[in-house]
Amino acid sequence: DDLEDTVNYAKACKFINKFMTENRFDLIEAVAEQTTRGLLKEFPKIKAIDFTINKPNAPIKLPFGNVAVSISRKWNKAYLSIGSNIGDKEGYLNQAIDSLYDDENCRVLAVSKFIETEPYGPVEQDNFLNGCVEIETLYEPKELLATVNRIEAEANRTREIHWGPRTLDIAIVLYNNDIVNEKDLLIPHVEMHKRLFVLEPLKQIAPYAVHPILNKTVSQMLEELQPDNKCAGCGGCSMKQMSEQ
């Protein structure tokens, strides 16, 4: 019971009033979305919001009592796997992390140490540098996918060769406890439990994060995938820790 742990409701009301008078919206859906995100960004102690906006004077030529939109938004916990095996590998990974820091819809909570791993697949290429990042984000899964794809593109990522070399690779490993099964997005990452180069850095920052399908922690999955067993994701990783971030 500490006031330091609460949000000042008067300040929140003033923020809403200022936000809605200084910005123009055509749709109440947009008002709800943008105001909610604004509140979550402005007041760090707010983790989730149920928000309703009423429009009792909507231009509807029929009898009605009220028109309203209700939404729920929150800071979502996500874990990203990052990797590079072209050029300044560490520089590309740090560029990705900096881009996440600069994104007002993301909060970087933790970054693992980087590890060096052998590549997977038939393509001869340099070893990878891999790491994991823990974030909170206002993005929904598809929005987060678009964001990490943009960050990859800014690092000149190309997809010409399957399992080929890349300047930057970012994968959404976990997103809350959600299961997403879409054509262009699978969460949790479909091969994460088989890949040391994902689990090893992920354990550094989230050993007790749980795979929502396998119902196993990161530590448990890593324990089952020992280096003397062949890693399905990299053929037996040769791992070396790099500088701490």
Task: List each language-model region with its residue ranges.
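Short, surface-exposed acidic-centric catalytic microdomains
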Residues: D1-A10, Q95, S99-E140
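N-terminal, polar/charged subdomain of small-to-medium soluble alpha/beta proteins
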Residues: D1-A78, Q245
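Residue-level signal for inorganic ion chemistry
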Residues: T35, N85, V111, P201
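A generic structural signal for short beta-strands and their flanking turns/coil linkers
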Residues: K47-I49, G65-V67, E104-A110, N127-G131, ...
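Short loop/turn motifs enriched for small/polar and acidic residues
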Residues: T52-P56, F114-E116, V173-Y175
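Solvent-exposed residues in well-ordered beta-strands and their adjoining turns
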Residues: N54, S72-K74, G83, E134-L138, ...
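Extended accessory regions or peripheral subdomains of proteins
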Residues: K77-I97, N105
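Flexible, gly/pro- and Lys/Arg-enriched active-site loops
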Residues: Y120-N127, Y139-L145, R150-Q245
